[in-house]
Structure formats: C-alpha cells, structure tokens
C-alpha cells in the first residue's frame, strides 16, 4: 500500500494552506486594482466647497492614466474635470499627501486672476474666456491677483472655494501640477449615500 501524502495525513494544514493562498490573492488583487483600475479617497478641508465637502468618499478612475502609461504617454485630464493628484509640496507631517482640485488650464495657456475673475487665454481664445462658465463656476469671486503661463507637461488647477485662503492651488503657492503627479479623475462620490453623484470622466 502506498504511503499517504503529507497533506492527506494532515488535512488541517491543507485547509490553512488554501486560506493563505486566498488571502495572498486578495491582497495582490486589491493592490492591482488600486494601482491600475480605481482608488478611493476621502475629502478633507473646505477647498472644493460647494462641490465636495470634508468626509466625502470619492472613487478615482485610474484606467485612463494606466492606458496612457501603457502607450508611453502622459495622461492629460479634461478641462473642468475634478482630479486627485500628488501634492507637489508634500512633506511628511506638514501637508496633505494628495489633493483634489478642478482642472483649469493646460500647457501654453495664460491664466489671469483679476477683480475676482479667472480668465484663460489661448490660440482659440486670444481675447480670453472664463472656464467657470462651463460648469457654473465656484459660486463666488476668485481671490488673488495672478498671471501665469502654464509650462510644458503641467496643468493649472484650482479649488471651487476660491475666496480668501480656503484653497491652496495654482493661484497662490501650489504652483502648476506636473502631469506625472495626476492620480486620476474623480468619477463618483460614493459617500454620503444622500449625495451619491457621478462626475465627468
């Protein structure tokens, strides 16, 4: 008679081994999804009011970023999209690691803030246009006195709460954001349940 295998003689070890494999698969699968498909973020601070609020749970779509990188390109979001990106000024313990803002302008465009109005100038609009008109704006004047031309490989972003110092963004100290720091566009507000909402992607 053939000798029983080790696992046959120790069935509990077989069960434990199967459980370990399952846990490893779950961890690896979660990491892959977070890296390449979507990620979840929580909003902190008032910078995106009246659109997003502290405690809102967001789903960020990683797929367009992943597809761009697979083609050896940088991902460029659309004007007006709400995006999450790595904070260029981040240092442990002093700043938020990731920020959420709205895309205002792209490389080569000139952005001005004057008398409470944000204006973008480009080849298509040499006299300038107000991007806030496309999404009903922040609902309040834009603070600051700014004039900047967006450098290559970067975007100009701003919060929706632009009065005073509620939003650190490209107007007032954050600077323009490198495309390689963009994590992805916000596709869904998942929480609170009473405010579930999809966003432009």
Enumerate the language-model features and the residues they cover:
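Soluble "head" domains of membrane/secretory-pathway proteins
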Residues: 2-17, 36-42, 50-201
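Hydrophobic membrane-insertion alpha-helices, especially the h-region
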Residues: 18-36
């Amino acid at each position: 008679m053939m000798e029983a295998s080790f696992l046959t003689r120790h069935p509990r070890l077989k069960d434990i081994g199967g459980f370990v494999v399952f846990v490893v698969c779950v961890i690896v699968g979660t990491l892959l999804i977070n890296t390449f498909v979507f990620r979840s973020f929580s909003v902190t601070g008032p910078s995106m009011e009246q659109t997003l609020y502290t405690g809102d749970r967001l789903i960020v779509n990683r797929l367009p970023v992943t597809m761009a990188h697979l083609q050896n390109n940088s991902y460029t979001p659309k004007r007006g999209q709400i995006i999450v990106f790595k904070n260029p000024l981040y240092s442990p313990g002093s700043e938020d690691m990731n920020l959420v803002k709205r895309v205002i302008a792209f490389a080569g465009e000139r952005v001005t803030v004057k008398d409470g109005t944000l204006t973008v100038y480009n080849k298509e609009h040499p006299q300038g246009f107000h991007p806030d008109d496309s999404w009903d704006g922040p609902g309040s004047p834009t603070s600051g006195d700014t004039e900047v031309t967006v450098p290559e490989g970067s975007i100009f972003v701003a919060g929706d709460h632009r009065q005073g110092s509620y939003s650190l963004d490209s107007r007032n100290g954050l600077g323009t954001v490198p495309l390689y720091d963009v994590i992805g566009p916000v596709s869904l507000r998942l929480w609170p349940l009473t405010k579930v909402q999809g966003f432009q992607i």
